[in-house]
C-alpha cells in the first residue's frame, strides 16, 4: 500500500504491478485487499491527493526503528519495513472519503508534483500530526499544498518564473 500517491496517477500497467507486489508481500492473492487498494487509488486520483491514517503497523515500525537505531543493519531495516508493509495491508490506512466534520488520526497528507510529466515526479508530504484533525482541516491543508505543487509544476514546465 506504500507509494499510492504515485501509483494512483500512473498507467494501468503500473497500478497492476503495484497491486501484484501487495499480493506477493501477503503470500497470495487477496480479493478484499485488491478492492481496498483499487478504491484507495481511485479516491486519490479523483481527489488529487492522498491521506493516510495512523495505524498500529506504523507504531510497530517506529518501535522497531528505535530498537535498531544504535545497532543499525540493512537486514534489520529490511525486516522491519517488510513487516510494516505486511501489517499495513490488514489495516484501514488510506482515507477514501473525507467527512468535513469528522475527526481523523492522520499520518500523512501527500500531494503529487507532476513537473513536466504526466505522472508525479515527487510529492509534498505533511505529517507528524500529533492530534486528530477534522476533515475540513485536511481539505484546507491539502488545498494549500496543492497550490504549491501546481506552482512547482508550472515553474518546471516554464509556464511561470520565480518573481
Where are these regions (language model features)?
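Residues in flexible loops and secondary-structure boundaries
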Residues: 14-15, 27, 116, 121, ...
